[in-house]
Amino acid sequence: MIENLICIKENDLVQWVCGASNILVSMPFLDSAMVDSTRQLVFALSQPKPLPTVLTIFNAQGEKLFWSAPPEGSIFYYLTFNLSKEVVVVCSYAEKQNGWHDWFYSWNMKNNALSRSGPAY
């Protein structure tokens, strides 16, 4: 179980405890991170220019499972939870997509891809 997530931005580190192990991951230009307790994952946004340009997902043991730039035409905005208590990333588009600028994207573990799950408002 992932516990005690700490973002140490000045040192570009994300740290957490998993069981008896202290996990420390280097994240250049760290912006933010959140724990997905439902799936036992750590989501991290990094490399802000000025908003984050990289999403990285780690398992509880600190192994990188997924890395992505934002979907085409969008920027990563922030991390939050959906109604299922899973971490999702909000992506913002300069031009409205189906009437909305901001959309929730979730990580599909089976397909190893981000998928748009609904408008963020």
Predicted regions mapped to residue ranges:
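Short beta-strand elements that form the blades of beta-propeller/WD-repeat-like
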Residues: 1-9, 38-49, 85-98
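Aromatic (tryptophan-biased) beta-strands that constitute blades/sheets of beta-rich domains
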Residues: 14-28, 63-72, 115-116
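Structural motif
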Residues: 9-14, 50-56, 97-105
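Histidine-/acidic-rich catalytic cores in large beta-rich domains
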Residues: 1-16, 57, 80, 84-88, ...
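Short, structured interface segments that constitute the first stable element of a domain
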Residues: 19-56, 88-90
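Repeated scaffold domains used in trafficking and secretory/extracellular systems
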Residues: 2, 25-39, 70-83, 118-121
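Short, compact, well-ordered microdomains
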Residues: 76-86, 92-118
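Structural recognition of the beta-propeller blade-terminating site
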Residues: 58-59, 108
